[in-house]
């Protein structure tokens, strides 16, 4: 049979993790196969039609900075864009976009189909070929065998997926799609820790049955933001508004009186749901003192009447769903197009992974996305890109790569997962990062694109745009530094008139920009400078105003990095290290951290224990030096 069976990398699953993994691998020049159960659902948004948000947009921008597809697909499909936390500092500002679900999926598929080195094939994966603790390939549903150096599993909610509506349940990967049962059984045979998690989705509403006049309109921002460093507002489709309404006492009464029919509260569902995206049942139960909860009415697209009521995810029986929806203001006559549901699925303890997202026990087998216990398109895409990159690096015989916590939110995400593990779906927040001021969404390209180019992820067009931006920032900062304004001159008076800022002596424009009351656009207007790229202007202003704080964080990072990156030997026996408590010895032996920094983030491992480890490593190193000299 003249059909390719040997590849460098095989990716299982065509969701947000799988598409980024396959694209990253193929961009690096290795022969990549993407196996999906249905080509029509590549890049499908299974839950809400939105990308970005607090902490999440930072991941999207980092994916973009490394050449990924998510941000550009969002710019081409986004029907509403907003910057959250706009009145706060740049560290926590976050771009969020409502996407047209159909356009987003179409854009992702177009990118995949036009990516060199990438083969797409519609088949379920039912088995892994493993020999001597090394993955060698996969077996599909119809018995085809494909071989590769690396395999990336991005199975989402499909592994052993079980859909719940009320007390009834059935197998499914998501509504309308079959689960991966054979692969789930195969995975449970491997020496990996497995658990069950749960997520859910609300009923979809026909917009023609909704009264928007009694809701609060939520328009997008003007000027319209963009998500990709390569994007622009001209890419965006027509922009629309979202709407806000609220639950009420009647809604809560309906839910509370039917909790005995909820699979979550009747013991039918065993998996743990996402803490930060709870079902409406959870909200009513956990926050019984609250009189109402916000419901965001989000359009599913420009060519459909379907609406996504964000905030009422539920797995209650359909008759209860209908009653609770119709109790909400503006939805008294609502028609439900699709019922809400909960889904349980298998995930694997991410503490069994290396930083590369390769499993510790099966060489060449990588995990990305919900299989690692995360929730969210952005978290999945970030892991997919990293896993695909490292799968390709392994196939090329090169060292693996993962950004540190002080380099990227991707680094924070991976370090949290493989060090701490998770017992509930993990969601990214800016509060999880220690160095938020350095890890802003606006500078993701300055942090990561050079590394992406080195890895082979960045094409010539993106590299040229990045270099132009980087050089433009340097030129403008130098211009501001070397341009001086004196009191009692035309420029000096213009600054006083514009900002009410008296000039007591000569200042450089860079010194003036550092003042909190002076903004870059106003400074250029007052001093007659030329307009420059808005991305360059943004960087110049942020870097200047926050220079002191940024320098302080950089100094702190430099101090910590020496011990943070100290490697712990694979064969280290923690039970032989005197001074460590039995509890800490047990935690270190179970987790097997790769570095001192990772060890320090294990719950219960004290600073004193880290000091003992450092002393042990120094003694061990000195002892080996003596052995070698003898």
Swiss-Prot record:
<dbReference type="GO" id="GO:0005829">
    <property type="term" value="C:cytosol"/>
</dbReference>
<dbReference type="Pfam" id="PF13932">
    <property type="entry name" value="SAM_GIDA_C"/>
</dbReference>
<dbReference type="InterPro" id="IPR036188">
    <property type="entry name" value="FAD/NAD-bd_sf"/>
</dbReference>
<dbReference type="InterPro" id="IPR047001">
    <property type="entry name" value="MnmG_C_subdom"/>
</dbReference>
<comment type="subunit">
    <text>Homodimer. Heterotetramer of two MnmE and two MnmG subunits.</text>
</comment>
<dbReference type="GO" id="GO:0030488">
    <property type="term" value="P:tRNA methylation"/>
</dbReference>
<dbReference type="InterPro" id="IPR020595">
    <property type="entry name" value="MnmG-rel_CS"/>
</dbReference>
<dbReference type="Pfam" id="PF01134">
    <property type="entry name" value="GIDA"/>
</dbReference>
<dbReference type="InterPro" id="IPR026904">
    <property type="entry name" value="MnmG_C"/>
</dbReference>
<keyword id="KW-0520">NAD</keyword>
<feature type="binding site">
    <location>
        <begin position="13"/>
        <end position="18"/>
    </location>
    <ligand>
        <name>FAD</name>
    </ligand>
</feature>
<dbReference type="InterPro" id="IPR040131">
    <property type="entry name" value="MnmG_N"/>
</dbReference>
<protein>
    <recommendedName>
        <fullName>tRNA uridine 5-carboxymethylaminomethyl modification enzyme MnmG</fullName>
    </recommendedName>
</protein>
<dbReference type="GO" id="GO:0002098">
    <property type="term" value="P:tRNA wobble uridine modification"/>
</dbReference>
<keyword id="KW-0274">FAD</keyword>
<dbReference type="Pfam" id="PF21680">
    <property type="entry name" value="GIDA_C_1st"/>
</dbReference>
<comment type="similarity">
    <text>Belongs to the MnmG family.</text>
</comment>
<keyword id="KW-0819">tRNA processing</keyword>
<dbReference type="InterPro" id="IPR049312">
    <property type="entry name" value="GIDA_C_N"/>
</dbReference>
<feature type="binding site">
    <location>
        <begin position="273"/>
        <end position="287"/>
    </location>
    <ligand>
        <name>NAD(+)</name>
    </ligand>
</feature>
<keyword id="KW-0963">Cytoplasm</keyword>
<dbReference type="InterPro" id="IPR044920">
    <property type="entry name" value="MnmG_C_subdom_sf"/>
</dbReference>
<comment type="function">
    <text>NAD-binding protein involved in the addition of a carboxymethylaminomethyl (cmnm) group at the wobble position (U34) of certain tRNAs, forming tRNA-cmnm(5)s(2)U34.</text>
</comment>
<dbReference type="InterPro" id="IPR002218">
    <property type="entry name" value="MnmG-rel"/>
</dbReference>
<dbReference type="GO" id="GO:0050660">
    <property type="term" value="F:flavin adenine dinucleotide binding"/>
</dbReference>
<keyword id="KW-0285">Flavoprotein</keyword>
<dbReference type="InterPro" id="IPR004416">
    <property type="entry name" value="MnmG"/>
</dbReference>
């Amino acid at each position: 049979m003249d059909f390719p069976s040997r590849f460098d990398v095989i990716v299982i699953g065509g969701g947000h993790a799988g598409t980024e993994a396959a694209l990253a691998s193929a961009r690096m020049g290795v022969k990549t196969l993407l196996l999906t159960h249905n080509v029509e659902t590549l890049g499908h948004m299974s839950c809400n039609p939105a990308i970005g948000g607090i902490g999440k947009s930072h991941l999207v921008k980092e994916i973009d900075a490394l050449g990924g597809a998510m941000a550009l697909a969002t710019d081409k499909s986004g029907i509403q864009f907003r910057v959250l936390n706009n009145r706060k500092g740049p560290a926590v500002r976050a771009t969020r976009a409502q996407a047209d679900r159909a356009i987003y999926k179409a854009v992702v598929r177009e990118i995949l189909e036009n990516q060199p080195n990438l083969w797409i094939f519609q088949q379920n994966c039912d088995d892994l070929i493993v020999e001597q603790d090394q993955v060698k390939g996969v077996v599909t549903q119809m018995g085809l065998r494909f071989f590769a150096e690396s395999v990336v599993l991005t199975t989402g909610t499909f592994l052993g997926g079980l859909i719940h509506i009320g007390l009834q349940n059935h197998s499914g990967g998501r509504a309308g799609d079959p689960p991966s049962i054979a692969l789930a059984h195969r995975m449970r045979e491997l020496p990996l820790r497995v658990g069950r998690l749960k997520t859910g989705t609300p009923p979809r509403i026909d917009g023609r049955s909704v009264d928007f006049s009694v809701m609060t309109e939520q328009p997008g921002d003007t000027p319209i933001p963009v998500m990709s460093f390569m994007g622009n507002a001209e890419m965006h489709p027509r922009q629309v508004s979202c709407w806000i309404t609220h639950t009420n006492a009647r809604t809560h009464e309906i839910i509370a009186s039917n909790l005995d029919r909820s699979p979550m509260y009747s013991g039918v569902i065993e998996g743990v749901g996402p803490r930060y995206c709870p079902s409406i049942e959870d909200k009513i139960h956990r926050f019984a003192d609250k009189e109402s909860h916000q419901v965001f009415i989000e359009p599913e697209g420009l060519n459909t009447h379907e609406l996504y009521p964000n905030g009422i995810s539920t797995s209650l029986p359909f008759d209860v769903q209908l009653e609770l929806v119709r109790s909400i203001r503006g939805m008294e006559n609502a028609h439900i197009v699709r019922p809400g549901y909960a889904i349980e699925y298998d995930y694997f303890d991410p503490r069994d992974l290396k930083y590369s997202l390769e499993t510790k026990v099966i060489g060449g087998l990588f995990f990305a996305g919900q299989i690692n216990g995360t929730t969210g398109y952005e978290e999945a895409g970030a892991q997919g890109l990293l896993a695909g990159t490292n799968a390709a690096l392994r196939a090329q015989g090169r060292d693996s790569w993962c950004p540190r916590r002080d380099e990227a939110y991707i680094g924070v995400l991976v370090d949290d997962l493989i060090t701490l593990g998770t017992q509930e779906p993990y969601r990214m927040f800016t509060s999880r990062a220690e160095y938020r001021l350095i890890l802003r969404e606006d500078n993701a390209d300055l942090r990561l694109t050079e590394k992406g180019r080195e890895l082979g992820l960045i094409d010539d067009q993106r590299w040229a745009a990045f270099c132009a931006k980087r050089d433009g920032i340097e030129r403008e900062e130098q211009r501001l530094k070397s341009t001086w304004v004196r009191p009692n001159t035309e420029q000096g008076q213009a600054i006083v008139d514009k900002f009410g800022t008296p000039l007591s002596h000569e200042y450089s424009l860079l010194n003036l920009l550092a003042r909190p009351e002076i903004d870059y656009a106003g400074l250029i207007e007052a001093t007659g400078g030329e307009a420059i790229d808005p991305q360059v202007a943004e960087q110049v202003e942020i870097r200047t105003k926050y220079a002191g704080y940024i320098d302080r964080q950089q100094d702190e990072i430099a101090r910590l990095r020496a011990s943070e990156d100290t490697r712990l030997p694979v064969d280290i026996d923690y039970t032989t290290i005197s001074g460590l408590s039995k509890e800490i010895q047990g935690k270190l032996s179970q987790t097997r951290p790769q570095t001192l920094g990772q060890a320090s983030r294990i719950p219960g491992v004290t600073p004193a224990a880290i000091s003992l480890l450092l002393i042990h490593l120094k003694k061990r190193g000195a002892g080996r030096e003596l052995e070698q000299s003898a």
